[in-house]
């Protein structure tokens, strides 16, 4: 196996592990996970969580530091996440009642995941 292929495989499994840990942390806060790795033609959402009428669109980043996790979510990624969220929302029968929030969960080595509510807002990527 090539070095590049091995690195991609490790990153893939690290991402899955981080998403599982982030989902668990959100469930402990009372959220229900309604989708994992929700893919659309416009982008992918790592986690979609819901508590009542509040829906979290969650980007999960596994990095060595919190700062690295923050900078890993680029404006381009935010646009793709928002576009995918719009498609998801269109498919919800109760969409008129729902409030969307774009959060991030940073998964750091040997630490509990750090949940950042309202990491970005729709249309504001800076």
Curated annotation (Swiss-Prot):
GO terms for molecular function: nucleic acid binding. It comes from the Bacteria. Disulfide bonds: none annotated. InterPro entries: Restrct_endonuc-II-like, tRNA_endonuc-like_dom_sf, UPF0102_YraN-like. Belongs to the UPF0102 family. PANTHER family: UPF0102 PROTEIN YRAN (PTHR34039:SF1). NCBIfam families: PRK12497.1-5. This is UPF0102 protein BCAN_A0183.
